[in-house]
Amino acid sequence: MKVQVEELSPIEKKLSIEVDNARVAEELSRAYSNLGRQVRLPGFRQGKVPRRILEQRFRDQVEDEVIQRVVQSAYVEAIREHNVEVVATPQVTNSGLKPNTPFTFEARVEVKPKVEAKDYVELPLTKSDTAVTDEQVNEQLERMRQSMARLEPVTDRDTAASGDYVTVDFDATVDGQPFAGSKAEGITVQVQPGELVESKIAALEGVKVGESKDIDYAFPQEYRVEEVRGKTARFHITLKGVQKEIVPELNDDFAKQSGVAQSIDELRTKLREDMEKARKSQVEGEEREALMKALLERNTFDVPRAMVERAMDSMLRGALQQLQRSGVDPRQLNLDFNRLREDMREKALQEVKGTLLFESIAQKEGIQASDADVDARIEQLANEAGQPVAVVQKYFKGADERLGLSLRLREEKTIEFLRSRAKYS
C-alpha cells in the first residue's frame, strides 16, 4: 500500500492511498465466496453457483461492499502509520475497481492542530478571597429556615393579608377563550408583589374566603405557552383558604430536622465548610476562565469545525442534564434546542482552543497525572459521594473513562502551574 499525505492547512490533510490489486482481488474473492454460500438461484444448488453468474447478477453490490471494506481498512492503516490525528469522518473519493489495476482513493480529513503555546508565564490574575464571613453563614441559615417553613391555616380571620399564602381556584381567558393551563383548582399563591406566573398576587389582599376577584395579567414575551406570549389574560380567582408561614427557630432541633447536623453549632461549622468549598470551586473556575482568555489573546490559531461542533453538543447535553438534576423537564420549556446550541458556538470555540493550549503547556512543562493521582481522585470522589471506593472504581474501570479522568487531572495540574507563575493584582 502506498500513502501520500498532503497538508492542505494546519487543520486539514489529504491522504492519497493506493491499494495493490492483489489485496483487492483477495477481498473480491472472499466477498463472492460468502455470497455464493448464501444466495439461492434457480437451476443451481446452494453454494454451487459459479462466480461468473454471481458477477453478472451482483457485481455492483459486491464491488460497493468491497470498496467500503478496503477503504476502511486502508484508511485506518494509513492514519496509524503516518500519525494523523483525525477529528472527524473523512470525505472519500475513489477511482472504482478496475481489473488488474491498483485501487486508489483520496481522503480529506480534519486533523487536530499542532499547537505550540507561547507567552504563558506571568499571565494576569486578580487575587480572590475564598473566605466565608459569619454574615454569609447567617444568610445561608436564614435561607434554610425559609426553605423548611411550613404553612398553617389562619383561624383568627378569613381575609387575606399581605404575606399570607392562600389557596385559590382560577379560570382564565385570553380574548374570551381558554388556553393551555388556563384552569386550576387548589393552587397555593402568596399575597405579595410579584409576577402571577411566579405564584405571587398582591391584588388578593383584603379578599375574603369564598369571594372572587377578576385580575388582568400580561404574559411575558418569553412565556412557555406560545399561544399567550405577550397577551393579556383575565383571571377569575376564587379564594378558598388562608394560611400563614411558620418559620422554625434556629436551635438544635432545627439542626436535627435539617438532616445535616445534631446541633446548631455543628450545622454552622458544616455550612461554613461547604460554602468555603463552593467558593473555592467558584474562584478556581473564574481563574481558569481568566487564564484561558489571556492565553487566547497571546496565541492565535484555527481549530477544526468538527471539534467545535462536538464541544457544542457536550455543552448542550450538560445544560439539559443540569436542568434535569434541578427537577426541570427541558421538554416542558418549549426550548429551541438548535438555537440554544448555536448560542454556545463562541463559548465552545474558546473552550476547544483553551484546552489545546493547556495540553501544549502540559507537554512542554512535562506535567502528567500518574496512576496514583487517578486512584487518589477516585477515592476522593467516593468519599464525597458517601460511596464505597469499589463502587466508584467500577465507573472508571473502562480505559476511556480512566483516560478522561487522567486528562482532567493533568489540566488541573497545568492550571495550578500557570497560577504559580501568574502575575497577581
Swiss-Prot record:
Family per record: Belongs to the FKBP-type PPIase family. Tig subfamily.
Keyword field: Cell cycle, Cell division, Chaperone, Cytoplasm, Isomerase, Rotamase
Any one annotated GO CC term: cytoplasm
Enzyme Commission code: 5.2.1.8
Pfam families: FKBP_C (PF00254), Trigger_C (PF05698), Trigger_N (PF05697)
InterPro entries: PPIase_dom_sf, PPIase_FKBP_dom, Trig_fac, Trigger_fac_C, Trigger_fac_C_sf, Trigger_fac_ribosome-bd_bac, Trigger_fac_ribosome-bd_sf, Trigger_fact/SurA_dom_sf
Comment block on domains: Consists of 3 domains; the N-terminus binds the ribosome, the middle domain has PPIase activity, while the C-terminus has intrinsic chaperone activity on its own.
PPIase FKBP-type domain: residues covered: 163-248
Native species: Myxococcus xanthus (strain DK1622)
Protein name: Trigger factor
Function: Involved in protein export. Acts as a chaperone by maintaining the newly synthesized protein in an open conformation. Functions as a peptidyl-prolyl cis-trans isomerase.
Gene3D superfamilies: 3.10.50.40, Trigger factor ribosome-binding domain, Trigger factor, C-terminal domain
Predominant location category: cytoplasm
Cystine pairings recorded for this chain: none
GO biological process terms held by the UniProt record: 'de novo' cotranslational protein folding; cell division; chaperone-mediated protein folding; protein transport; protein unfolding
